[in-house]
Amino acid sequence: MTTPRSLPFRLGMAGYTYHKFSLDETLAALERFDVHDLCVKDFHLPLTSTAEQIAAFKKKCADHGVTPYGVGPIYMQTEDEAKRAFDYAAALGVPVVVGVPWKPAADGGKGWKQRRQSPELCAKVSDLCAKYDIKVAIHNHGRNPATGAPALFGAPADVWEVVKGMDRRMGICMDIAYTFADGFDPAAEIRKYASRLFDCHFRNISDPANGSSGTDSANGKINYYNVVKALADVGYEGACGIELANAFPKNPDWIPASVGYFRALMDAVARG
């Protein structure tokens, strides 16, 4: 009998999955599903929270057996906004900010699809990484203009090109669904950018060309066994956050189904 190997990463939850739910509802659900790691969004803990509010938040999480593993995505347009994100992460005690340094389009548009990646702000964020010893994982948003935001770090390669010469704590939050929908093999991308991979968002899609077409994780088009195996093979040590925001809460069964599916894949990979 093969002895299962111990996988270095954990299954968590992207906070945005519960953007229509209160913190209490979110933590109760995570406890029910035996998920212990949460990437915190600011609708559950505002960026302007006081030290007392942050302490109360951490206690409430602990009471449900949940540990914040990161914060974000946080969209930052200025150096002051970036510094606020780092102060927030430091106060919460998390090692990574899922961040998106951006600037408006030339026509001044600030809508999600009109935002542009900002290498200039990334350079300042890189300095903050060194100052705070906190990682930044930049979230890719898809290269297809119909379903993503190609000018806002469309693919992991677009993040890499900006951060590769910056502080080693500047890296990637790989949205697996957008990566796959853009025609990339997510497992190969994980192996390629492993040295700067600091977070993963696990989503599956029903339409292989549409990175926004949500479905429960077990019934989509992405081969997640290969994704999980790649993460294990490269020694990825972060969390993998399940993200189902586009389809949830209309399909509440998708959350436990996805948790069970990914746990089964992790067990299969561990057993070789």
Q: Where are each of the predicted segments found?
A:
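Catalytic-core regions built around general acid/base machinery
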Residues: E52-D63, E120-K131, E189, N226-A230
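Alpha-helix boundary/capping detector
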Residues: A56-F57, F86-Y88, R115-R116, A257-S258, ...
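Active-site acidic/histidine proton-transfer and metal-coordination neighborhood
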Residues: T3, D24-E25, E31, D37, ...
